[in-house]
């Protein structure tokens, strides 16, 4: 410390660092930090089956078929955002969870999608319209 005092690490200390470096406002992890890490794991998006199991477990939703359909839409939106360089939002596991929870309340996946996965994917009205027509309405017709 600047005072000259030393703080000793407990021998059982484990430090976990997580980051979403591709999000706006986040930076790449500093090289000096990386060089001090013993293990580094990049965690990719889980497959649809894993997404469905996790979301059902967290939300208490029991409709596996509907949750799988919703997970497919989320995957399609994320891919469409990558392809068209829509980068002002997010569409992944947290958004899927929000959509499932909202749908459990509203009983209307389409309406719930508008205020969860679509709203989270982009703030731009044109981008949202594109995601609705190319991804959401392939599975949920209004």
Segments (PLM) and residue ranges:
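C-terminal regulatory/interaction module of P-loop NTP-utilizing enzymes
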Residues: 1-142
């Amino acid at each position: 410390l600047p005072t000259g005092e030393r703080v000793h690490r407990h021998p059982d200390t484990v430090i976990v660092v997580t980051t979403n470096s591709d999000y706006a406002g986040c930076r790449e992890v500093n090289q000096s930090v990386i060089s001090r890490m013993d293990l580094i794991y990049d965690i990719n998006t889980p497959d649809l089956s894993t997404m469905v199991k996790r979301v059902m477990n967290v939300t208490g939703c029991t409709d596996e078929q509907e949750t799988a359909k919703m997970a497919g839409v989320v995957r399609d939106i994320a891919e469409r955002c990558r392809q068209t360089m829509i980068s002002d939002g997010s569409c992944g596991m947290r958004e899927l969870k929000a959509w499932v929870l909202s749908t459990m309340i509203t009983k209307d996946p389409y309406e719930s999608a508008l205020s969860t996965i679509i709203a989270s994917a982009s703030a731009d009205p044109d981008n949202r319209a594109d995601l609705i027509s190319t991804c959401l309405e392939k599975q949920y017709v209004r």
